[in-house]
């Protein structure tokens, strides 16, 4: 029984550490090369965009750990759907170009913070957000290449 408690605690601590990086309550806009127009849009929509972080964190981490973290931190239990709705509000209010820049910033901010497997899953989830929000296909430009989200 003691071993189970130790393993459960260790797993929760690992999940808490990983989720912390995915759920930063703000965006580090200083390290990214975002246009001033998009920087303004991201700052204006930041409270809703943070919900995108939470949605992705809940999706890539085991929901049980995320729920436990929410309760420990006094946030109550909020559903993935609630975070997705808030995220969609922000993405629909922003110009496509700025959504693309924000998504790139999200990926850049997580590099080196989380493991490669979680990073790949997070990127996949991030690319699926526009579709989940009912936003038509977007053209994004990165490193001289065009790609569709």
Swiss-Prot record:
Expressed in seeds (at protein level). Expressed in seeds. Changing residue 38 to G: No effect in a competitive IgE inhibition ELISA. Residues 1-22 form the signal peptide. The keyword Signal applies. Changing residue 52 to G: 21% inhibitory efficiency in a competitive IgE inhibition ELISA. One of its GO terms (molecular function) is nutrient reservoir activity. Disulfide bonds join 38-98, 52-87, 88-133, 100-140. Residues 108-117, 132-141 are annotated as: IgE-binding. Residues 41-53, 68-81, 84-95, 97-105, 121-131 are annotated as: No IgE-binding. It comes from the Eukaryota. Keywords: Allergen, Disulfide bond, IgE-binding protein, Seed storage protein, Signal, Storage protein. Pfam families: Tryp_alpha_amyl. Seed storage protein. Belongs to the 2S seed storage albumins family. This is 2S seed storage albumin protein. The lineage of its organism: Eukaryota, Viridiplantae, Streptophyta, Embryophyta, Tracheophyta.
């Amino acid at each position: 029984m003691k071993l189970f408690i130790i393993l459960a605690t260790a797993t929760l601590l690992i999940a808490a550490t990983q989720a912390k990086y995915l759920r930063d309550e703000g965006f580090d806009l200083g390290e990214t090369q975002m246009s001033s127009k998009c920087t303004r849009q991201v700052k204006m929509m930041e409270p809703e965009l943070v919900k995108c972080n939470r949605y992705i964190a809940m999706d890539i981490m085991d929901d049980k750990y995320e729920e436990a973290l929410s309760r420990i931190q006094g946030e109550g239990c909020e559903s993935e759907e609630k975070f997705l709705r808030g995220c969609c509000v922000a993405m629909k209010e922003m110009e496509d170009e700025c959504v693309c820049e924000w998504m790139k910033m999200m990926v850049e901010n997580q590099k080196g913070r989380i493991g490669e497997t979680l990073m790949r899953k997070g990127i996949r989830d991030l690319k699926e957000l526009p579709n989940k929000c009912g936003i038509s296909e977007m053209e994004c430009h990165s490193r001289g290449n065009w790609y569709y989200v």
